[in-house]
Amino acid sequence: MQTEQQKKLALGLFMPNCSNMPSISTHRVVEDQWTYEHNEAIALAAERYGFDYLFPVSRWRGFGGDTNFLGTSLETTTWAAALLRATRSIQVF
């Protein structure tokens, strides 16, 4: 593993912690892709493949309308605490 001084670029993921993440349209790919279990699986895989950090989408309210884009989300502080408990070395913002 490289030291922090040797690293030139940190790679991270924007996590799917809100409903309807892939698209603002009415098309639904997978309804439950924003669950904690799904986020934990992504976090563990990201850590295993050497990603440096995870970054949540922070929304308190959705956009309303037919899709209520990002209308339901995992609260970010609790989300971060749970993922920090589940992982060993990846940074969680």
Sequence positions of predicted segments:
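Conserved strand-turn element in the central/C-terminal portion of the radical SAM core barrel
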Residues: 92-93
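N-terminal beta1-alpha1-beta2 module of alpha/beta enzyme domains
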Residues: 1-89
